[in-house]
Amino acid sequence: MMGLSSFFLFASLSSAPTVGPDSTVFLETTVVTANRTEQRLENTTVSVDVLPLRVLEEKANARVEQVIQMAPGVTLQDGQANIRSGSGWSLGAGSRVLILVDELPALSPDAGGVLWNAMPMEAVQQVEVLKGASSSLYGSSALNGVIHLRTWEPSTEQRVRVSTMMEVYDRPKIRSLGWWDAPRARSAVRFAFSDSYGAKNQHGLVLHGQLFGDQGYQYLVGDQSARLHAKYRFKPNSKLEMGLQGQVWRSDRSSALIWEDFRLGYTPLDSSATHTQSDLAALTGHLKYRQGRQLHTLRVRGMGYANASGLDSNDYSNAGQSLHAEYLWQYFMEQGWNLSAGALFIGSAMNSPLFSGAHTSQNQALFAQVDKSADRWDLSVGLRWESFAVDGTADAQPVLRLGGHYQVREGTHLRASWAQGYRFPSIAERFSASAAGALQVFPSPGIQSESGWTAELGIRQGVKKEGTRAGLQGYLDAAFFWTEFNQMLEFTFGKWGNLPGTTLSNYGFTSLNVGPTRITGLELTGGARSYIGPVKVEGMLGYTYALPIALDPAGVYATDADGQALSYESTSLDPSQNLLKYRYVHNAKADIQASWKGWTLGSSLRYNSFMANIDAIFTDPLIAIFVPGVADSRYQLNQGDLFLDFRLNKRLTERFVLQAGVINSLNRLASPRPALLAEPRTVSLQLSYALN
């Protein structure tokens, strides 16, 4: 959409993830995201959620974001991931949540966003969500947290998974929305293969890929893509590991920014959509060498990509190359001491009319961390120096991280942490100059980096009751968090052009530093597994209360094209509570599943409270002439968003499973941001084959 494309590639360098039995996440789960080394979940010093395997495998998910949105405290707004209301709506330009695939960033170098349908969903083994500022570990874009997808590693025995699925869009409740005559659907064919060969399984191989097609529920908006991933690992002995990974991806897609009207919410403004054809090729190499208690890891990744615009009148084509190199040294000492240190270099070059020509960027970092573990407690201290330069304009900042964990008694774990965060604006945020229909996207080259900190205090209680037929295993977790940002960047709608007359071309979006902000809140999560007679029952739940507020609501942070001073108070639709725009105060998730004799019945619930504050200009009578229906939609959809999903699976044989599902079974309308309606109810069917 508008050429704000997201391209990425994947490198695999971590060992295979370990999850609790029967797909439910309990205290024996290990994670790598918290400290960049394997660690028991209950011993982490920060909040890390691990999605149960059943959310990945038991649901007929068309896209990986359907999995991600089940994580407690995580929301997706128009494809942008947010954690604990740390971000608003950014149109795919810039992200405060870093997306990792096997420990390497999966954000585009130009826009800093993610294209979810290119994620390796068929080979995802574990999804870890680290919450809070994580820049000391992972650098810029981890200001609000990390979502880490860990994929298959070469297996000692042959492992195969093949699936084909189709998902059909139902007609919406409002008849005028359903513009189509024939059924609309999306479908996918996926495969994943893993095995090892040779003496002592020296040679390991993983192959996986997908063909995907989406006819879309919006008029003229669809997506067709194909991708292939190959991973080779060579381990001649216990000390040395080398590997190569390649990826190719092609996508042919259309998108739309603004609706025609609320009652025509699935028809783009002026019945027009932007069309983009994207190509990517990437190659990654890694080397790991263990020398006694020391581990050396080198990763090098090269990528080339191209975006071809489908419009002559609005050329947003772009192309670029990127090089990523990182060295990590780890020293696992005696008496529970671990040392980590490393260096990072990322260089990118791109050229596009969308960004007003050619640009180059460089990112360098030095980082170090000390971890200490004893019988009942763990301590962690990390420091990172980060430097960015775009077209010769440089910025640098150190960030610090402190964390501690203490086991009060068996099953009871306390944690506390404080961490700084830092994010440099993406090239798209600084230089994008394009159009979405009659609306414009305006450049903002003078914006500054944003920084902040997060503090958290949490407790996790494990529950394990044995000796009865039912049994019980589970956990409860509570966390209080406090986050503050300086010079927070927000995507803002307003009048930024000065063409003569009253024209919509003067209005659009730009990125602005809006001053200091604060987010405080409480998060409760839990999971359990038990038996009711012969029926196995397992479930998870999460509730997040986040209060995001502006600390200087009257402070002027910009002026529009008419010279009018802009502040939080003057630009907000509802400034009465100082709530930041495009945020949810309440967010809840739940999933429950029952299994018996090859049958599995499950249900998921997702809830967001009403988005109380947006840019006031969206409801201005003048703008309503050009972008109608925003005020009407907010009046009609003012009770929040509640989605209830169901699934039914039948194991046909030892290796074949038939899965049926309904997403948004109540067929509720939702507007995740102004002038956009979420998809209606969908009904899916999937046939899967699995070996080992």
Predicted regions and their residues:
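Surface-exposed extracellular loop regions of Gram-negative outer-membrane beta-barrel proteins
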Residues: G357, Y406, E410-E456, F480-L512, ...
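Short acidic/polar hinge/loop motifs at secondary-structure boundaries
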Residues: L104-A133
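Extracytoplasmic beta-strand/coil segments of soluble accessory domains associated
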Residues: E65-L104
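Flexible loop and strand-edge segments within Gram-negative outer membrane beta-barrel domains
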Residues: D214-K235, K239-S322, P353
